[in-house]
């Protein structure tokens, strides 16, 4: 009953437009006072500090800054030109370019919002010029950008790994196959729509154009190789890889492409600071809520109540998917992770689900939730760029959401899909 009151209070505050971080912190502090006493407030400042200073979380601002640098230093534009030269000649090619570029960008930024801002600001206006509807342009940009929280290095996985005390590198490896499946599914859907609605082609395929685009994008292509190669090869941790991503983006954008001056760098840093502040404030205030939840042993109570109904992993995963989809529809991805992970981890451990497997289930649910109103943070960003109504765009976006849902079902009930590479490399 207490857990239901907490969730109801959070949703009530969010629905009256209280910032999510403030809502979580308020519920946490009130819970501490009511159930632990006023004297327990002395623990709140230290809990706030400790919650936001876990070492793995250092990767979050660094990857956010790397994404901002990519967006302002010509790196993302060169990736767009390369993918256009590769698949633009296919009917509906610009939509497929959108998917491909989002997957490339995801391998560096790890953020769906950064992805949609970088790719959407360039591709959505181009798609509208070529007679793609604003709704379709916004929908495919949003759906493909959501792959950024599945494809490594995902900020959502870093956050989950830090909270669940799970290997972030293994989470990254587990996200490779689901991310590719999601991208292929969206590309196939684009091809189907292109044939059905006679969508335009770009210029005819040209080997010389492809060669030129590849030469210009070569250094941009080295970024994911450096970052992911270093992490997967065991040469660096995810946090160190994030630092290398920033350094590489600075060198490539500033010294090689020469598009990164002090003014551009200042703008990128400011954008990065704003995005980081949002995430880290959520992390800090959620630690206070976690203090209250732990003291009340609410996660353990939830595990006992669900296992009293069923211990069948199939049924439990179905219930968790419903819960996660609903949370993803109303909460920012980071807020949903911070809220749900401490609550459900005892249940996950009790029924024998691998935390890595559950991490992929969680992030896929959030990818779908980011596309689904009423909040739909990524879809809303895409619609603002396309200047189109979010509810009208949602109608067009439903088949793309269905593609992501199919990937979710495969990952949920065929654990080998996310876990095969993990077991191959780490035993």
Kindly give the residue locations of the regions a language model identified.
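Alpha-helical transmembrane segments of multi-pass membrane transport proteins
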Residues: 1-427
């Amino acid at each position: 009953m207490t857990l239901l009151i907490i969730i109801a209070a959070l949703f009530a505050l969010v629905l009256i437009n209280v910032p999510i971080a403030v809502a979580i912190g308020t519920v946490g502090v009130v819970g501490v006072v009511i159930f632990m006493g006023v004297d327990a407030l002395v623990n709140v400042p230290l809990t706030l500090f400790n919650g936001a200073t876990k070492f793995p979380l250092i990767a979050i601002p660094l990857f956010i800054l790397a994404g901002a640098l990519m967006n302002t230093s010509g790196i993302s534009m060169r990736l767009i030109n390369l993918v256009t030269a590769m698949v633009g000649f296919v009917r509906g090619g610009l939509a497929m370019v959108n998917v491909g570029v989002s997957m490339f960008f995801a391998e560096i930024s790890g953020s769906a919002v950064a992805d949609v801002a970088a790719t959407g600001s360039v591709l959505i206006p181009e798609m509208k010029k070529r007679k793609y509807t604003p709704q379709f342009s916004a929908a495919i940009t949003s759906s493909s950008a959501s792959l950024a929280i599945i494809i490594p290095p995902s900020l959502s996985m870093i956050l989950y790994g830090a909270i669940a005390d799970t290997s972030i590198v293994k989470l990254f490896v587990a996200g490779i196959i689901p991310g590719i499946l999601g991208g292929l599914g969206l590309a196939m859907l684009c091809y189907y729509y292109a044939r059905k609605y006679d969508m335009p082609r770009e210029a005819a395929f040209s080997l010389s154009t492809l060669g030129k685009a590849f030469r210009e994008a070569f250094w941009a292509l080295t970024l994911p190789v450096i970052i992911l190669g270093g992490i997967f090869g065991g040469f660096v941790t995810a946090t160190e890889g994030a630092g290398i991503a920033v350094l590489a983006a600075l060198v490539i954008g500033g010294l090689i492409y020469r598009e990164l001056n002090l003014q551009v760098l200042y703008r990128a840093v400011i954008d990065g600071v704003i995005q980081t502040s949002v995430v880290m404030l959520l992390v800090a205030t959620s630690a206070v809520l976690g203090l209250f939840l732990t003291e009340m042993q609410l996660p353990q109570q939830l595990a006992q109540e669900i296992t009293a109904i069923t211990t069948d992993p199939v049924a439990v995963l179905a219930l968790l998917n419903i819960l996660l989809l609903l949370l993803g529809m109303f909460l920012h991805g980071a807020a949903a992770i911070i809220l749900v992970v401490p609550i459900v981890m005892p249940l996950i451990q009790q029924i024998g689900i691998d935390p890595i497997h559950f991490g992929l289930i969680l992030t896929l649910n959030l990818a779908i939730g980011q596309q689904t109103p009423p909040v739909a943070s990524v879809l809303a960003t895409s619609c603002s760029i396309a200047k189109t109504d979010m509810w009208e765009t949602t109608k067009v976006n439903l088949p793309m959401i269905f593609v992501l849902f199919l990937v979710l079902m495969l990952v949920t009930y065929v654990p080998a899909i996310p876990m095969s590479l993990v077991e191959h490399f780490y035993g």
